[in-house]
Amino acid sequence: MLDDFKIDLLVKNKPPTSTTAVVAMSGGVDSSVAAALLHKLGYKVIGITLQLYNNNKNSNTKGACCGSLDTKDAKQVASSMGFPHYTLNYEKVFREEVIEDFIDTYTQGKTPIPCIKCNQVIKFRDLLNATKSLGADVLVTGHYIRKIEQDDDIYVYSSKDTKKDQSYFLFATTVEQLRLLRFPLGNFHKEDIRKLAKYFNLQVANKPDSQNICFVTDTYKKTIAELRPHTIKKGNIIDINGNILSQHNGIVNFTIGQRKGIGISSKAPLYVIKLNPDTNEVTVGPKSALLQNKLYIREINWLAKEKIPHNGLNVKVKLRSSHSGSPATIFPNNNNTATILLQDSYCTVTPGQACVIYDHDRMLGGGWIC
């Protein structure tokens, strides 16, 4: 069975028995298999699970991750395989840098992706520092993404399992972080990972994939109302000409492109076109007013060695994780920003989301949509 799951050495020219690998264990099947596989291959595995919020509150939320039951699952996997496991409490920094950012972004009329922020400031910053302090050689995760090192250059590619590819969520990972990160599952398919979990007799073998944001116990609005109630205020819903159509109970209830749940009867479908936090107004209109072929991104993390030429670079862009990608041209601007011009399509542009840039299946970098 293990002959079908060959991976490159985690550290070049260093045998597994001399290599210490910290594995970030969420309690799910992917990170559990990554840890178990490396342990079976002879690596010195240390499992670490991060406690990021009040686990008891969300422990039984269907489809959520990182709850107290997930921590127990991770510990059980480590115990059954015979490698050490530790839980690190990062609740304070998670609240300050992920949850507060999530609320800030929503109240600004944007749509956040807290999982990317968590990867950026918790897993691939603080957990990497913990990895170094333990004297470990690498930090391993169960993400479906491929990384190739040639000489001193690093290339990142989408997973062979395109349905499970997670490169979109890792665009903000820096080159220096990537030097210590390893993704052993990137060349495999999810169904094969579940088979391996059963081969190892892991109790998480049939555990469903997490789909919800870990700290959201019900709805986004309810979470924001609990943590920052004063930010939810009534306001006007207007059309594209500024005419008042109705009232809303807070712009946090809306996202650009939304059609359902607007609460207005109309002969033609209405979509959320704009959210204005300054006036607390929600603008709605026809789909034609929603579609764009130009967008701007900020805080670009560029992984490719080649710079973006001033006359533009033809690329493929993904504007959401489920997006298959659209051909586009990227033009560099000042202050680590860029303009993206879609070549043959119009789409919904949602501020706060990520725009991730590819050359075929190679991830070049990305940025946040303005």
Curated annotation (Swiss-Prot):
Catalytic activity: S-sulfanyl-L-cysteinyl-[protein] + uridine(34) in tRNA + AH2 + ATP = 2-thiouridine(34) in tRNA + L-cysteinyl-[protein] + A + AMP + diphosphate + H(+)
Subcellular location per the Swiss-Prot or TrEMBL entry: Cytoplasm
Known function: Catalyzes the 2-thiolation of uridine at the wobble position (U34) of tRNA, leading to the formation of s(2)U34.
Record SUPFAM superfamilies: Adenine nucleotide alpha hydrolases-like
Species: Ehrlichia ruminantium (strain Gardel)
Gene name linked to the record: mnmA
CDD domains: MnmA_TRMU-like (cd01998)
Residues reported in the UniProt entry to bind ATP: 24-31, 50, 142
Its EC number(s): 2.8.1.13
UniProt protein name: tRNA-specific 2-thiouridylase MnmA
Keyword Lipid biosynthesis: no
Residue ranges of the region described as Interaction with tRNA: 164-166
GO cellular component: cytoplasm
Record's keyword terms, sorted: ATP-binding, Cytoplasm, Disulfide bond, Nucleotide-binding, RNA-binding, Transferase, tRNA processing, tRNA-binding
Active site: 118, 214
The keyword Nucleotide-binding appears for this protein: yes
Record-linked InterPro entries: MnmA-like (IPR004506), MnmA-like_C (IPR046885), MnmA-like_central (IPR046884), MnmA-like_central_sf (IPR023382), Rossmann-like_a/b/a_fold (IPR014729)
Annotated GO biological process: tRNA wobble position uridine thiolation
Cysteines joined through disulfide linkages: 118-214
Gene Ontology MF annotations: ATP binding; tRNA binding; tRNA-uridine 2-sulfurtransferase activity
Domain of life: Bacteria
